[in-house]
């Protein structure tokens, strides 16, 4: 099955973007192929561009507390108690995290130079920066992975918070089986509810991909046929509406 996720507000869009960038970083850190370190540095700078914003930390703490209070008001179960404990721990980690506003590399001239070159038209190129080439040649894969892991330590609480919140959101979903012979179908929403995420699941070898447009009253699903031909057979898929 292939799953597509569509945020219904800018806050969830931001959370999804941050989640994906962290996943990209983890994948490249475990990649032994040539130029993976180049991508790791570029991705690390992307992470720092949002992690160094003080408002993100505040927003995450507020959302964590909101979810904790919601769970506290529900019937006590082992699972709910565990989640509340995890949320308390994550909030504490966020509050203690040393996130400094702006790009601050603690006087690390090597990182400052890499950041400058990452913003140049050619990006990070070892030919233009002998010190970077020396670093690549003098470190092993294990050492480079440990280097990046250490750099992410101070902002790991952001990754954990985002991952936990998105897990809670995806688990609080109402799914519907949908079928259409046209390339468009509408699902009506309850305007009194606050919906955060649309999750569309298609077969593993689909002949189309979805896009959506939405408002507080409905989600319009647009199915784009890859071949460009008109659809003759019914398309079946799952439509999930998730909310905090």
Task: For every predicted segment, state its role.
Residues 2-62:
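N-terminal ordered "arm"
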Residues 4, 33, 77-80, 104-107, ...:
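Alpha-helical rod/repeat scaffolding segments in eukaryotic adaptors/tethers
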Residues 7-17, 40-43, 60, 79, ...:
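Amphipathic alpha-helix face/heptad-repeat signature
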Residues 46, 70-74, 115-119:
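Eukaryote-specific, cytoplasm-facing alpha-helical/coiled-coil scaffolding segments in long proteins
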Residues 52-110:
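Hydrophobic/aromatic-rich structural module bridging two neighboring secondary-structure elements via a short loop
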Residues 79, 181-187, 241-243:
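An exposed acidic His-Trp-rich patch
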Residues 93-195:
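Charged, well-structured binding/catalytic surfaces in domain cores that contact anionic ligands
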Residues 192-244:
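Extended, charged low-complexity segments
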């Amino acid at each position: 099955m292939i799953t597509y996720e569509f945020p219904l507000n800018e806050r969830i869009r931001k959370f999804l973007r941050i989640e994906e960038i962290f996943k990209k970083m983890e994948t490249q850190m475990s990649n032994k192929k040539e130029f993976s370190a180049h991508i790791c540095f570029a991705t690390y700078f992307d992470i720092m561009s949002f992690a160094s914003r003080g408002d993100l930390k505040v927003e995450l703490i507020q959302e964590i507390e909101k979810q904790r209070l919601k769970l506290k008001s529900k019937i006590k179960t082992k699972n709910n108690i565990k989640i509340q404990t995890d949320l308390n721990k994550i909030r504490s980690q966020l509050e203690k995290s040393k996130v400094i506003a702006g790009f601050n590399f603690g006087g690390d001239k090597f990182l400052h130079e890499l950041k400058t070159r990452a913003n140049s038209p050619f990006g990070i190129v070892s030919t233009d920066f002998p010190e970077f080439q020396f670093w690549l040649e003098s470190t092993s894969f294990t050492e480079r992975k440990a280097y990046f892991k250490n750099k992410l330590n101070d902002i790991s609480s952001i990754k954990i918070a985002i991952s936990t919140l998105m897990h809670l959101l995806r688990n609080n979903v109402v799914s519907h089986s949908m079928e259409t012979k046209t390339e468009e179908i509408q699902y009506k929403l309850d305007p009194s509810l606050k919906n955060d995420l649309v999750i569309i699941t298609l077969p593993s070898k689909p002949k189309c991909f979805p896009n959506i447009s939405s408002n507080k009253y409905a989600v319009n699903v647009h199915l784009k046929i890859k071949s460009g031909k008109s659809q003759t057979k019914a398309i079946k898929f799952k439509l999930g509406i998730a909310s905090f």
